[in-house]
Curated annotation (Swiss-Prot):
Name of the protein: Uncharacterized protein C12orf50 homolog
Pfam families documented for this protein: DUF5571, zf-CCCH_3
GO biological process: poly(A)+ mRNA export from nucleus
Record region (Disordered): 136-168, 298-322, 350-382
Organism, scientific name: Macaca fascicularis (Crab-eating macaque)
Cross-referenced InterPro entries: DUF5571, Znf-CCCH_3
Bilayer-spanning residue ranges: none
């Protein structure tokens, strides 16, 4: 269109003396031009008309094919636009709901809420759920924990003397303390009763713990049954009931320290032998030490006695035997316990702390005859000594250990 309009405008350079020099000048030229030997005739109106006529059909031809294209491309219905951003749709819906709240009645609002709740419930139904077994176990777990906590708070359902009753819901530190303190009750079995004093006439005693971890105590302690080597042979001919005696091997320093405390208390106050008190050493860590204490006679020997446990005088034993046979049987069982306890001290004592011919031999032993007690009970001294040597290779025996319990004779002579 600009070319057609420009062709109707006369060229400015045509009025100049040199004329229009441009070959491709689009303006109207009334005069011919000669540009570098090229002759250009003047532009006429016919050409303008032709050009204008040619331009019009071109436009019509270009517009005609557009019409069928428009008819084809135009859809009958409005196009469906899909929105991928769902948040915007929700916001628009909320705005529409907010705008329509003013016009809706409360019944319609309640209906919409009910529909939304139903949709939410249906969505919850189709979601992933844990199986009911897990849910039931989760619900049962807190109830079981509560039931377990009740007897722990009351302390009534815990059995007396049962060392295996340990509360489950405790920390590791409290659990260790509970295991240690649970052994303070009365034992049920015969073996435990025999260790605590034996039979009906035992003194209730407490087990002493001196602050050792359970792992260390388990590694250090080795349980040895001596019933095969000592008690079975002794009890073959005796009418007393057979009872297996279990002893524990502990380090020598702990046994000696515990027995030294007992001997010091006996020296200061002889009546303290009948009292049951826990022995504690604050400056060392030890293992639990069971001590066997019985009713001692009031007449003690000379002050040179350093023994932890004394042998009872035979006169009192004979009176016990005459008065009560059961009491005499228990005292006879005490003899084995005391002899084994003293032997642990004598065998495990280090040489530099105890002299070879020390005060262990300074024991007041009444050598009067004992007709009612079988002498076979004293025969197990040498047999037990050899058994201790076999089972405890690191222990050192004394040459005069056999003189602690000499065999009494019928006539009373040595």
């Amino acid at each position: 269109m600009e070319m057609q309009q420009n062709c109707s405008i006369s060229c400015f350079w045509e009025t100049q003396p040199l004329g229009c020099v441009k070959i491709s000048c689009i303006f109207y030229h009334s005069k011919p031009r000669n540009i570098n030997g090229l002759f250009l005739p003047p532009s006429s109106n016919i050409t303008l008309q032709k050009e204008s006529q040619e331009g019009i059909p071109l436009q019509t031809q270009s517009q005609e094919p557009l019409k069928p294209q428009e008819n084809i491309s135009r859809p009958i219905h409005h196009p469906l636009v899909l929105k991928t951003n769902f948040e915007e749709e929700e916001e628009v819906d909320e705005q529409n709901d907010a705008s329509s709240l003013w016009t809706k009645t409360p019944e319609e609002i309640e209906e919409k809420r009910a529909i939304k709740e139903m949709c939410y419930k249906s969505g919850e139904y189709y979601r992933f759920h844990t199986p009911p077994d897990i849910l039931s176990s989760k619900s049962m777990a807190p109830t079981a924990e509560k039931e377990l906590e009740k007897p722990l708070e009351n302390g009534s359902e815990l059995q007396e003397g049962d060392s295996l009753t340990v509360p489950t819901k405790l920390s590791q530190y409290e659990r260790q303390g509970e295991i240690k303190t649970s052994l303070h009750g009365k034992p049920k079995t015969d073996i435990a009763a025999f260790e605590n004093g034996g039979g009906d006439c035992y003194v209730p005693q407490r087990v002493i713990f001196l602050g050792v971890d359970e792992s260390e105590a388990l590694t250090e302690e080795k349980e040895i049954t001596i019933s095969k080597c000592s008690n079975t042979k002794d009890n073959k001919d005796s009418p007393h009931p057979k009872r297996s005696l279990t002893t524990r091997l502990v380090p020598t320093t702990h046994v000696l320290n515990a027995t030294e405390n007992i001997s010091m208390k006996c020296r200061e106050d002889p009546s303290s032998m009948n009292d049951v008190q826990p022995v504690k050493k604050p400056h060392f860590k030890g293992v639990k030490k069971r001590k066997w204490i019985y009713d001692e006679p009031k007449n003690f020997p000379d002050s040179g006695m350093r023994r932890a446990v004394q042998t009872p005088s035979p006169q009192n034993k004979m009176s016990y035997h005459r008065n009560n046979k059961n009491r005499n049987a228990e005292n006879a069982s005490y003899i084995h316990v005391q002899r084994d306890a003293v032997r642990t001290v004598a065998l495990n004592a280090p040489p530099h702390s105890r002299p070879m011919h020390g005060s262990y031999n300074k024991v007041h032993v009444n050598k009067e005859p004992k007709p009612n007690l079988s002498p076979d009970k004293y025969m197990s001294t040498s047999y037990n000594d050899s058994a201790w040597r076999k089972r405890i290779p690191f222990s050192k025996t004394y040459s005069k250990s056999g003189k602690i319990y000499p065999e009494p004779r019928r006539n009373g002579s040595k």
